[in-house]
Amino acid sequence: MQRKLIEIERRYDELTQLLSDPEVIGNQSEWQKYAKAQAGMTDIVEAFREYSEVVKHLEETQGLLEEKLDPEFKEMAELELEELTEKRDELEEKMRILLLPKDPNDDKNVIMEIRAGAGGEEAALFAGDLYRMYTKYAEQQGWRTELLSASYTDIGGFKEIIFLIEGQGAYSKLKFESGVHRVQRVPTTESGGRIHTSTTTVAVLPEAEEVDVAINPNDLRIDIFCSSGPGGQSVNTTQSAVRITHVPTGTVVSCQDEKSQLKNKEKALRVLRARLLERAQEEAMGELASERRSQVGTGDRSERIRTYNFPQGRVTDHRIGLTLHRLDSILLGELDEVINALITTDQAERLKSEA
């Protein structure tokens, strides 16, 4: 690990010099390329430099303890040695995590798809709860959200809702949300007060750029129709809604939320690109996935990952055995404790597999 860290630090210093070179400054695209590369190394280089300082002080303190010291000074040196040893171990762990191979999608924006599953209207209402939970979480992170497509039910739920979350590290934090979310509560329509169990499926896709997925226009069938609202009523007498079918894969995306046909087409293409990228990545990762099953989850949409129990005010993530008794705040977007626990578990698993 030490040799690798020294190489990274050397390259970081080279990039620092290049970024102040007048020729590089004059070439904006080259300067941006070097700046991005350097930014990706900053955390690990800072940790390594701090680690080097700690090790230096640790050796000095150990040297002091080998000399004859008065009892009070010796006690102080032993305490400092203990603190420095703890700090060194923490930094070693941090550097091992920072050296783990990075998911190439981690810096991408997210296209999130939420669909009502078993439970009829109650599942559709819960889909709305999850949509609000994720948009509030995004707001707390300083991210931007944009509705791409929605299919409403008569009482204000969603059969399906697709939206974009745009911001630094969005995919890295939200990727473990894919799967089946189960809700246990008494529906508002239930007169007997019985608890019902319903499910909603969440899919988290990294937003694909045009360079990530090449789509041949000849492979697309585009249908135009009038948009409709809850209960199928007509919202718009003009044909502004768009349905795009990618013929080779049979992937279909519809969008009708904008009044402009062009905007609906643009949004539908964004969702289509994300789905095609996911499909390609699933095929490429198929063999690896069968060899290594992560405790945090495979990202399979059919995997039950979390239960929201309203009578007990409880949220349980089944993958890591985490139970929190603060359902209300979680539904208000306070997801950090859950998300950080999932990220930590994933990192621990990857460290174990790298060992």
Swiss-Prot record:
In this chain, where does the modification N5-methylglutamine occur? Q233
**Which keywords, in A-to-Z order, does the entry hold?**
Cytoplasm, Methylation, Protein biosynthesis
Post-translational modifications: Methylated by PrmC. Methylation increases the termination efficiency of RF1.
Instruction: Tell me which Gene3D superfamilies the record gives.
Output: 3.30.160.20, 3.30.70.1660, 6.10.140.1950
Task: Please give an example of a GO cellular component term from this record.
Answer: cytoplasm
The cellular location(s) given in this protein's UniProt record come to: Cytoplasm
Query: Superkingdom, according to UniProt?
Result: Bacteria
Molecular function terms, GO-annotated:
translation release factor activity, codon specific
Q: Does the keyword Repressor apply?
A: no
Just give the chief location class: cytoplasm
Pfam families in alphabetical order: PCRF, RF-1
Q: Which HAMAP family match?
A: Rel_fac_1
Q: What does this chain do?
A: Peptide chain release factor 1 directs the termination of translation in response to the peptide chain termination codons UAG and UAA.
Q: Which family does it belong to?
A: Belongs to the prokaryotic/mitochondrial release factor family.
How is this protein named in the record? Peptide chain release factor 1
What species is this protein from? Desulfitobacterium hafniense (strain Y51)
Lineage of this protein's species? Bacteria, Bacillati, Bacillota, Clostridia, Eubacteriales
